[in-house]
């Protein structure tokens, strides 16, 4: 895709060039077989020196030891992490103590009780009537 005045990248073949031109990397990917462990030493090591990674997607994207090594080597300046392989993040995990890692609480929104009850009840009634239900996850897509 071409956008005037914007450098665009597409597909895995363009990923190395994209990373080399990036100071910040924000992961918003679904967790699939193709994206598991995508935030690894090779991928993160291609970011510009002094880069920063932000993961608000899924903990399975990040290889913890690779991130720690790149932070400790000075290649990466920092990381902001909202999701982890094990949640809640164990108290003894090094992410809590690392000076270049910011851990944020994984809460995107507060659940509103009355609205949630109405939504669930509405979906049950739609299913009983044989109607399509919105928001159904398709496991064949991997997310």
Protein language model features and the residues they cover:
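Rossmann-like adenosine-cofactor binding region
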Residues: 1-94
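C-terminal helix-to-coil terminal segments
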Residues: 87-143
């Amino acid at each position: 895709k071409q956008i005037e005045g914007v450098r665009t990248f597409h597909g895995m073949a363009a990923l190395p060039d994209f990373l080399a031109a990036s100071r910040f990397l924000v992961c918003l990917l679904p967790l699939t077989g193709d994206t598991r462990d995508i935030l690894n030493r090779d991928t993160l090591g291609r970011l510009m020196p002094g880069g920063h990674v932000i993961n608000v997607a899924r903990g399975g994207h990040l290889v913890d030891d690779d991130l720690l090594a790149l932070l400790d080597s000075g290649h990466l300046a920092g990381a902001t992490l909202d999701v982890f392989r094990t949640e809640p993040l164990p108290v003894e995990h090094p992410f809590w103590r690392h000076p270049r890692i910011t851990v944020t609480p994984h809460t995107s929104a507060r659940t509103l009780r009355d609205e949630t009850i109405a939504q669930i009840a509405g979906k049950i009634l739609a299913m009983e009537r044989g109607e399509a239900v919105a928001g159904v996850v398709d496991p064949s897509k991997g997310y």
